[in-house]
Regions:
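A hydrophobic C-terminal alpha-helical subdomain
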Residues: 13, 211-271
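Conserved Rossmann-like nucleotide-binding pocket used by diverse enzymes
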Residues: 40
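Oxidoreductase cofactor-interface core, primarily capturing Rossmann-like NAD(P)-dependent enzymes
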Residues: 2-37, 45-48, 55-58, 67-71, ...
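Periplasmic-binding protein-like
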Residues: 61-63
Length: 271
């Protein structure tokens, strides 16, 4: 059953959040976006912002910054989930990672908060190539990244947003955990070849070591953050996630979008 609840999107300016907002507004759902820079201010590092941001929200989409795998994520996510439930939230949807045992405590905290919950675990976003840290390398003609030849089932943020919007508005998704992937396994080299073909830009993929990637990040990120990213990518892209799931189809009743569909839509970014 579909039910329109006042909805809060934490991190609503991100890759999935802004797409979820578009879908909810199109359905007439009352929605607020909360982030460090939004009109509704929310900062994971400043608990004084949490209660005012929650307001009268009855459904909450939770995305954690910097990543749900960091050691302090579970404590903060759990505290926020319990506070939301105490204030009357009926539905919590958590964006999580696929194949990351570090995120399980945060997932458990949401499941045990007392509200209906949905956990959305995602593979590597397609949009990281066009809206994230990888786009600069593509525009420069070489994507250097520590992924070797591992094959990943890249998932489109459009599919993620469709699943999240459904979970926030339809009680049939309560209690579900969805593992979302795209419909095929591709190496990062395959992805770059597809991007090159559809955009007309000459791009090559160069696999690099974790240490080399850390050195590449050094001018742009604090050492601790760079080390965390290298460790995270090493964990996620070691091959254990090289399998497809039916999460999109289970949630939406349709097949997930293929990487080529995403790349065709995003091609103007790389031209």
């Amino acid at each position: 059953m579909t039910k329109q609840l006042e909805t809060l999107l934490i991190g609503g300016a991100g890759k999935t959040g802004r797409r979820v907002e578009t879908r909810l507004r199109a359905r007439g759902v009352p929605v607020r976006v909360a982030s460090r820079s939004a009109e509704t201010r929310f900062d994971w590092a400043d608990e004084s912002t949490w209660e005012p941001a929650l307001g009268e929200a009855r459904a909450v989409y939770i995305t954690f910054y910097p990543d749900l795998a960091v050691p302090w994520a579970a404590e903060r996510v759990g505290k926020l989930a319990r506070l939301a439930t105490e204030r009357g939230a009926e539905r919590l949807v958590l964006l999580s990672g696929r194949g990351e045992h570090q995120v399980w405590p945060a997932e458990r905290a949401v499941r045990e908060a007392g509200a209906a919950f949905t956990i959305v675990r995602c593979a590597f976003f397609c949009q990281n190539f066009s809206e994230g840290a990888l786009v600069d390398g593509i525009l420069q003609g070489e994507l250097a990244f520590p992924a070797g030849d591992v094959r990943e089932p890249f998932v489109d943020a459009e599919d993620i947003a469709d699943v999240v919007a459904a979970a926030l508005t339809d009680e049939r998704h309560a209690g579900r955990i969805y593992d979302l992937t795209g419909p095929r396994l591709m190496s990062f080299g395959d992805a770059v070849t597809e991007i090159s073909r559809l955009s007309g830009r000459s791009v090559r993929y160069t696999p690099v070591s974790g240490e080399a990637y850390r050195e590449m990040l050094a001018p742009f990120l604090p050492a601790e953050q760079a080390s965390f990213l290298v460790e995270l990518f090493g964990m996620l892209l070691d091959g254990h996630n090289s399998l497809l799931t039916d999460g999109v189809e289970r949630a939406l009743g349709r097949k997930p979008r293929d990487f080529s569909e995403y790349a065709r839509d995003a091609a103007s970014v790389w031209r």
